[in-house]
Amino acid sequence: MAFQGTSRTLTQQSSAATSDELQKILFSPDAIKKMATECDLGRHHWMRADNAISVRPLVPEVTHGSIASFFKSGYDAGELRSKGYMSVPQVLCAVTRTVSTDAEGSLRIYLADLGDKELSPIDGQCVSLHNHDLPALVSFQPTYDCPMETIGNRKRCFAVVIERHGYIGYTGTTASVCSNWQARFSSKNNNYTHIAAGKTLVLPFNRLAEQTKPSAVARLLKSQLNNIESSQYVLSKAKINQNARSESEELNVESPSFAIGSSSASRSEAFRPQVVNGL
């Protein structure tokens, strides 16, 4: 039978002072800066030839040490039940290419545990993306909470690993990866349902159709068509008659008569206003 009870959060388990201390560790200006610079949280990471394999921990080393010390002191004092766990419900990566679609290359993205020397994908959650498949959204869901421990000189936590393959002749940036996640820390841990890594291919953005109104290109085409029409028909002393029963204005134009079957008559009858899609 599955457990159906309730569990207390870290804030409920600790005093307000220790809770504020943890908040300061996680959300201080220095901690936020390190999350950006060391982990690339919410930032675009460029995949280059000189950076073919990228390993980005989800927690900076300094922040990891501060959190581990916080939990250890609470554990040694008998205030907390464990030395702390890191929980990440989901990691979402937005991947876009920065080269043409005919470039031969691919990316291999997966979530790893820094406690594993081999850096193997967690539960086989690994996604391969060919260059012509991009853009795409990739998601990972760890099936366990990671202990906040140190193994040798390694700070154990989850990490996003990105491998670049191929792209012969392209030494610069071939793809951009923007990763987002929300790390949680608690004195309790759990196991979670295994979910395969998600891969959603996204249609490239059609910036010419982003507006509901006629675009600048459509307006230009319309103006060109109007210029063509005005160049073919020259109004000579047109008399404007206003009808009181109608809101429109009628133009009475005296145009020269054409012989039936002549080339001029055929051109006149064959001409029809052209319609541009979206106008």
Curated annotation (Swiss-Prot):
Keywords: Host cell junction, Transport, Viral movement protein
Organism: Cucumber mosaic virus (strain C7-2) (CMV)
Protein name: Movement protein
Function comment: Transports viral genome to neighboring plant cells directly through plasmosdesmata, without any budding. The movement protein allows efficient cell to cell propagation, by bypassing the host cell wall barrier. Acts by forming a tubular structure at the host plasmodesmata, enlarging it enough to allow free passage of virion capsids.
GO biological process, one term: transport of virus in host, cell to cell
Pfam families for the chain: 3A
Positions of transmembrane segments: none
Entry's family note: Belongs to the cucumovirus movement protein family.
Compartments where located: Host cell junction, Host plasmodesma
One GO cellular component term: host cell plasmodesma
Region forming the signal peptide: none
Family matches, as InterPro entries: MPV
